[in-house]
Amino acid sequence: LWEIVAAVQEIAAATKFKIPGYITGSESGMAVYDPFAPVTNESTTIYGSDRDVFIFLVDDLNPIEIGKLPNGEPDLVFRGFYISNSEVGAKSCKIATMYMRGVCQNRYAWGVEDFSEITIRHTKFAAERFSDEAQPALRSFSNGSTTKVLDGIQAAQDAQIAEDEEQALKFLQKRVGLSARMAKAAYSRHGDEEQKPLKTIWDASNAITAIARDIPHQDNRLDLERKAGQLLDTVAA
């Protein structure tokens, strides 16, 4: 496993991907995403044990602006990827794309840019093969056009799924599969963080990924983030 971690470090050194920064305060009192914030035990996105590993890195020095925040600041999304083999007894590692929104650090397991998921079985030369396959694919991903991301998010923002709280909660439970308690928590969190009611696919994906941030176990968090990505897939061209 740690050979794979070393391979990821090699990839990070050769590409633009890194451990994400985090939100800090500014002199004006506004929350600001700082890509150069020092890595701490609380902010790291590398998790591992003797048997499993989960790593999430982003290209947060090349943001994609998807609109404006209520305070007039740009609303930024960053390309990223994760590698995981945390399923019990897993005999392979996989790498797939993910996106992170700067203002809230929500993560979306979304394959809108057609990045082919890479799977590497644990064999003697797994780390070398992983680096050889993943490095060029991630470099291409990082340097690609932002059109599909922007079009996908715009489509999600335009796709209305609810007119009131009752309809939104019903959608989160019936369509997404959240429990009544989780649906209520997601709806409330979205209102608190976005300062508007949940009405669109984009709103729902942000609500889901917001409550996912509270989940300490990465596998369980990723399950919710995949649900958000699947929602976005329903409207992305």
Question: Could you tell me what each predicted segment is?
Answer:
Residues 2, 7, 12-236:
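Intrinsic disorder/low-complexity polar-acidic segments
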